[in-house]
């Protein structure tokens, strides 16, 4: 791609959208794109895609700028922000479904749904700033994944702009397109490499009447994981998070591992279920605003400062042993087989590579996998953020990319195997 191609593309996009809708990148966006376009509808996105294909200009959806800023080592030419596409298209309270544009943040959507006693129970860190498109593209989920699942579990429809500016829809009665792809599963976690998500439909849940949080200390990680497993068998928990000592200290439990679990329901249900929580040694129970504050702190828990942070996924029964064998600081979504692990302090490149290799070896031994979430700037370009899948799987993924994006304009080099 030449500078002339970029200049032609920028001029064409300014004419299509208006000069005020094309701007310089802000903060994290500068690590993702050289300029940013802010379309107001799917038709404008389609026009942008056609320009990019004609001029061979790469574009990146910027809803997940925080995630992309970690993965992408060099910015693409054009970032597409969906901040102006933030409308609720349809909300059916009786059916407990909602359709919304991809630029709407999860926080804004849930404030509107709360008027009807409903919510979309997905809870990534920083949900107030997390756009729905980013939620899907990066497959983000938090503590509530234990009870409510991940975006893939609540998504019932998706609309996106793909190759040649075509608008494609899947969901409802149209579960698969004519090529046989399950579009909802394909687009969730695709990191913007197959198209630009413009609209999504979700099933909703009622807001719980009451909420009780339990925090219990443990001398050993294995004891905390065993207690979490017993609780998961006994109760319909909202979440069951196990924290290593560095993170447990932020909740007032220094030098120990902590299990933070929660239940929800009406008053009689909560009182009945509290009996199982009280059986934990040293447990403290919290209700009302204090319980809510604990959950919010848990949801938005950050690892910073960390040289490397990664997400580990194994079978639920293997998670505790795998995390212990790694020996890093961690937060684990017990019962789900998912944990985030991190290495604090400073580390050189050789040490970083050795650490990541050791983490990945432990994940493979537990029949799991590991993805780097963040790394210090000096390390970021030198590390493989994704595990290498088996050759047959990678070949299938490349074929999927070629079918959806033959021109290679959608966020290239930002996924598994450089896809």
Q: Where would I find each of the regions flagged by the language model?
A:
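A generic structural motif
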Residues: 35, 79, 251-264, 336-345
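Short, surface-exposed ligand-recognition loops at beta-strand->loop->(often short) alpha-helix junctions
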Residues: 2-4, 215-223, 268, 309-321, ...
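A conserved active-site cap/scaffold subdomain adjacent to cofactor or substrate pockets
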Residues: 217, 227-286
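Conserved glycine-rich FAD pyrophosphate-binding loop
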Residues: 40, 57-58, 69-77, 81-83, ...
């Amino acid at each position: 791609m030449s500078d002339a191609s970029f200049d032609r593309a920028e001029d064409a996009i300014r004419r299509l959208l208006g000069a005020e809708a094309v701007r310089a990148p802000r903060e994290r966006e500068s690590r993702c794109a050289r300029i940013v376009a802010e379309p107001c509808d799917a038709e404008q996105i389609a026009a942008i895609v056609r320009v990019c294909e004609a001029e061979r200009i790469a574009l990146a959806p910027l809803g997940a700028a925080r995630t992309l800023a970690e993965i992408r080592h060099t910015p693409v030419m054009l970032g597409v922000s969906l901040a102006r596409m933030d409308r609720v298209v349809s909300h059916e309270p009786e059916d407990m479904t909602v359709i919304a544009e991809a630029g709407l943040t999860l926080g804004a959507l849930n404030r509107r749904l709360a008027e009807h006693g409903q919510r979309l129970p997905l809870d990534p860190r920083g949900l107030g700033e997390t756009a729905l498109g980013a939620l899907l593209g990066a497959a983000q989920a938090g503590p509530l994944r234990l009870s409510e699942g991940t975006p893939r579990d609540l998504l019932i429809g998706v609309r996106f702009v793909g190759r040649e500016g075509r608008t494609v829809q899947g969901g409802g009665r149209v579960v698969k397109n004519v090529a046989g792809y399950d579009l909802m599963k394909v687009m969730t976690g695709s990191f913007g490499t197959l198209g630009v998500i413009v609209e999504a439909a979700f099933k909703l849940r009622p807001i719980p009447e009451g909420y009780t949080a339990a925090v219990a200390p443990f001398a050993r990680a294995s004891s905390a994981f065993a207690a979490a497993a017993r609780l998961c068998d006994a109760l319909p928990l909202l979440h069951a998070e196990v924290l290593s000592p560095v993170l447990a200290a932020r909740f007032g439990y220094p030098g120990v591992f902590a299990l933070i679990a929660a239940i929800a329901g009406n008053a009689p249900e909560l009182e009945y279920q509290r009996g199982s929580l009280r059986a934990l040694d040293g447990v403290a129970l919290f209700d009302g605003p204090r319980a809510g504050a604990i959950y919010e702190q848990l949801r938005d828990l950050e690892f910073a400062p960390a040289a490397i942070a990664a997400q580990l996924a194994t079978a639920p029964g293997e998670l505790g042993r795998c995390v212990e064998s790694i020996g890093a600081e961690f937060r684990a979504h017990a019962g789900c087989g998912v944990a985030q692990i991190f290495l604090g302090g400073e580390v050189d490149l050789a040490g970083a590579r050795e650490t990541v290799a050791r983490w990945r070896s432990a994940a493979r031994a537990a029949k799991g996998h590991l993805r780097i979430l963040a790394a210090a700037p000096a390390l970021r370009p030198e590390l493989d953020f994704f595990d290498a899948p088996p050759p047959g799987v990678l070949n299938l993924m490349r074929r999927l990319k070629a079918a959806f994006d033959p021109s290679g304009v959608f966020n290239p080099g930002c996924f598994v195997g450089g896809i």
